[in-house]
Regions:
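An alpha-helical interface "stripe"
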Residues: 1-189
């Protein structure tokens, strides 16, 4: 019996998501696994994200950012003396990324209201301390499908976004020329 392979955009999304997360959104829904906070990915897997967790104004996945910061830097966060830590940190983070770029901010972190926050722990070598290995394992890589992103155009979506600790690193707009989808025809986001 000959079977046809799925070559559409959604099938490609499924393959990518299954490879990174371990399951697809549809598989999780069918199994009743909808609690995003109950995830415990192993060292080879990513968290799965929800489009609603993106703060569209500041372009940050709030769930992953704050989960990472609260898990890895609780003592530093306790130094905060202002009135709204999430707004102040997220606003300054967005400004730092806009000014210095994502890579520099991930490497160096940033300071806000007497706190020095790290946003990524680099992969240690085998000779590095146990603490370095633990910190690296606390990074939260995540993948979100069908990510809405615009305050001005609420229906606009990007096929997939890959985040590290809530900060978007890569966006994927999948196109399949076999089905007539091309960047030239469908436009750029």
């Amino acid at each position: 019996m000959i079977t046809t392979s799925k070559t559409n955009e959604q099938a490609f999304e499924w393959l990518i998501e299954r490879a990174l997360v371990g399951s697809t959104k549809e598989e999780r829904e069918a199994a009743g696994l909808t609690d995003v906070d109950a995830q415990q990915p192993d060292a080879q897997q990513y968290y799965w994200g929800l489009p609603k967790d993106l703060d569209k104004k500041w372009a940050v996945d709030m769930r992953r950012l704050w989960s990472f910061l609260e898990t890895t830097q609780k003592e530093e966060l306790e130094k905060y003396t202002g009135s709204d830590i999430k707004t102040e940190v997220t606003k300054l983070l967005s400004k730092e990324i806009e000014t210095f770029g994502v890579i520099k901010v991930l490497r160096e972190g940033f300071e806000v209201n007497n706190m020095k926050l790290k946003l990524f722990f680099p992969k240690p070598s085998a000779a590095d301390s146990t603490l370095s290995h633990v910190k690296y394992s606390q990074n939260q890589f995540s993948l979100t499908r069908q990510q809405t992103y615009s305050v001005l155009k609420p229906g606009e979506e990007i096929d997939m976004v890959l985040y590290v600790n809530g900060i978007p690193l890569f966006t994927f707009e999948l196109k399949n020329p076999w089905t007539g989808q091309t960047a030239k025809y469908n436009g750029k986001k």
